Amino acid sequence: MLKLEAPWGDDTRSWGPPFQSGFDGEEVASYFLSCNRGKTIETVNIKTEQDRIRTLIGEVDIVIENFKPGTFEQIAGEIPDNVIVCSISGYGQHGPRRDEVAFDLTMQARSGIMSITGDADGGPAKVGVAWIDVMTGMNAVSSILAALYQRERNGKGARIDISLWDTALAALVNQGHNALAGITPGRMGSAHPNLVPYKAFEAKDGWFAIGVGTENQWHKLVAALELDAPDHWKDNSARIAERSEVEATVQEAVASIDRSTLERLLIGIPNAPVNTVNEALADEQTEARGGLVEHEGVMTLASPLRFLQPSNEKSDV
């Protein structure tokens, strides 16, 4: 992958602290390192080197650009018929907001995601990582793969229009459909609008998440924690109707139990301690799955993709 940066470099090189030695030995923000493993980086001046850019476009299979709508066409000129171009922007290539600038924060705000994130009695909050940015990239990859498959059949490239806005709206999933059904979603902390219990509870030594999604899991929870639960709570709809009572009952039970004991008690029920990021990186499953990899002297998060060969041996891809 060839990445073209402005002569002064990608802005995220300075998005710190923290800073650390990068893949080329230059000190850059850790943020930059999280997004640029495995890329060959060159600098280019889009105002004076358009011929070079157009030559490069003619030599590649895929171009990904995130200029303001309309800018790429001025720079790139005529695109070869077999090249796939994926444009990523804030609001897409058309519509009344197409020329507005956007960040992940503003997407989470305008899309309603911040209105449903955070404690019920607190202010709106954003997800702790650039969630919309990440999912937009995943949507771009999916679209590019589909375009490559199509090109194998007809030999033609494609122009793909991916936006943070479309991604944010699609990411509303069940909450968006709750709104379409006439219910106005709101902030619920770690709780779930359609499942109870499904949230983080305060255990003896920290926060602990428990999620019940089936009647069988509910019965297991009642038995494991010896809950004093009325029979009608076996139905999720009844538990939703009496959410505060159900959650209070579970909270009372877990308050005196430490998290490691809860994990042992709740086998078969989705559960987990609320870890810090450092605890997650040190988890035995992270090591077993190769979740951290060293790349050119820098420790990085591994790709989540795992390819198994027919022999069940891990692929080198």
Where are these regions (language model features)?
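Oxidoreductase and adenylate-handling cofactor-binding alpha/beta cores
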Residues: G137-G157, A170-A181, V222-A229
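Short Gly/Pro-enriched turn/cap motifs at secondary-structure boundaries
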Residues: F32, M188-P193, Y198-K199, A241, ...
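Conserved PLP cofactor-binding pocket of PLP-dependent enzymes
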Residues: I267-T286
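N-terminal helix-loop segment corresponding to the beta1-alpha1 unit
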Residues: M1-R153, V317
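Flexible, small-/acidic-enriched active-site or ligand-binding loops
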Residues: V293-V317
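Glycine-rich beta-alpha junction loops
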Residues: W8, Y91-G92, L164-L169, D205, ...
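Aromatic-enriched alpha-helical interface/lid elements that frame and gate functional surfaces
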Residues: V196-N271
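Conserved Rossmann-fold dehydrogenase catalytic segment
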Residues: Q93, D121-V129, E152-A168, G186-P193, ...
